């Protein structure tokens, strides 16, 4: 885990050097797409399959179809839960979130169950089209095209799970039903674009292959536009789950042939992985590891609540690069037996390192240019502003 304020050079000093070590596969959160532009070509020369999954410019992205990884009703429910994101819905009454979940469950299940839907048509665009068919018109239930489609599916398969889920919602009064439909449409309006429809029409990523061959997946996310957060969260949730299932069911010793490391920048802001507090405790045995990048520990608590403590405890290494949150500074001060004032005013370009079983120590941050020179790697093609060393004369001696 890496904790540091904006501008602490977390990407330059931690993510980039680890990425360029070229050990195993990587799944990297890439705000603005800079990492892909800087290092994509280099990784190709090192034998990597390089994948650009862009939620900023979906028209330039490889295709990703979440429904391609759904085969059970449990996976359907997980997909719906991530997309609805009950914890951040803002609904005081759980009835509305539960209704949205059941409706979305029924739509996804219909696409997977219906014999008239071709495999190539099993995508998110088909779900949105079904949602548009749910209007009842003049408040008459039988006027709903979706209702009739569900009835037809029930005639074909009396045990249809899609039909059962839909009936749970369809039994609502007309006014309530229409509100559920309108709320669901509004929730997914930001995803209803031609570019996303093209990107999600089929799947080119092949998640399992990430654990089979050296692959670098750059997940481009916006640090200002949060409209794609649900899809981003879904991708990370599905990727971790699929790799764990593959390791458990098909790999020797339940370990991936190629280790996979996730670099999750701005983790607590745009990524809320389903059951991550449980997952992080178990993924290590499958040769899956995670580097979480945060601005503060309180930021993690805001997203994960009490589960944040479990996540922190399961990280063997903590790199603290300094920030302005007094609560986080106090927590770090207790760990290294320093005052909160000392931690809040630690020198620029230094970090405290905490490793399980070792005494904490302070060190100077790695300079990326020195690392590139040592490894004889061509410097970044993207020009950057000169970073002047501030307060260099005040940096304390390194502790060993």
How should these model regions be labeled?
Residues 53-54, 294, 322:
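Short beta->alpha connector loops at strand-helix junctions that form conserved
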Residues 370-384:
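C-terminal alpha-helical "lid" subdomain
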Residues 3-288, 303, 338-362, 380-400:
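P-loop NTPase motor domains
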Residues 42-43, 67-68, 306-310, 334-337, ...:
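Short secondary-structure boundary/capping segments
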Residues 292-294, 314:
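Catalytic or ion-translocation cores adjacent to nucleophile or general acid/base/metal-coordination motifs
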Residues 295-299:
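Conserved H-loop
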Residues 306-331:
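Conserved P-loop NTPase catalytic core
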């Amino acid at each position: 885990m890496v904790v540091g304020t904006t501008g602490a050079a977390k990407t330059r000093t931690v993510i980039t050097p680890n990425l360029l070590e070229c050990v195993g596969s990587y799944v990297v959160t890439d705000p603005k797409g800079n990492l892909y532009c800087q290092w994509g070509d280099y990784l190709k020369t090192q034998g990597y399959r390089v994948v650009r999954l862009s939620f900023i410019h979906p028209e330039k992205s490889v295709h990703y179809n979440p429904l391609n990884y759904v085969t059970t009703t449990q996976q359907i429910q997980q997909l719906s839960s991530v997309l609805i994101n009950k914890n951040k819905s803002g609904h005081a009454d759980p009835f509305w979130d539960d209704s949205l979940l059941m409706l979305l469950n029924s739509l996804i299940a219909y696409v997977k169950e219906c014999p008239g839907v071709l495999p190539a048509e099993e995508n998110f665009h088909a779900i949105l089209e079904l949602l548009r068919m749910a209007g009842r018109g003049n408040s008459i239930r039988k006027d709903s095209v979706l209702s009739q489609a569900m009835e037809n599916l029930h005639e074909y398969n009396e045990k249809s799970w899609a039909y059962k889920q839909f009936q749970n919602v369809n039994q609502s009064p007309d006014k309530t039903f229409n509100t559920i439909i309108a709320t669901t449409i509004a929730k997914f309006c930001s995803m209803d674009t031609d570019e996303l429809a093209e990107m999600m029409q089929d799947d080119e990523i092949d998640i399992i292959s990430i654990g089979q061959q050296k692959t670098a997946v750059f997940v481009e996310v916006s640090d200002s536009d949060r409209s794609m957060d649900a899809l981003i969260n879904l991708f990370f949730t599905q990727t971790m789950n699929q790799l764990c299932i593959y390791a458990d069911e098909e790999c020797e010793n339940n370990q991936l042939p190629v280790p996979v490391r996730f670099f999750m920048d701005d983790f607590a802001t745009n990524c809320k992985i389903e059951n991550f507090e449980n997952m992080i405790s178990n993924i290590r045995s499958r040769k899956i590891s995670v580097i979480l990048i945060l601005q503060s520990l309180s930021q993690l608590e805001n997203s994960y609540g009490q589960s944040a403590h479990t996540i922190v405890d399961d990280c063997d290494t903590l790199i603290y690069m300094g920030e302005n949150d007094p609560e986080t500074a106090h927590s770090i001060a207790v760990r290294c037996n320093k005052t909160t004032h000392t931690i809040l005013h630690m020198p620029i370009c230094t970090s405290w390192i905490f490793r399980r079983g070792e005494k904490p120590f302070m060190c100077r941050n790695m300079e990326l240019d020195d690392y590139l020179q040592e490894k004889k790697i061509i410097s970044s093609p993207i020009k950057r502003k000169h970073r002047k060393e501030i307060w260099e004369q005040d940096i304390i001696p390194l502790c060993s």
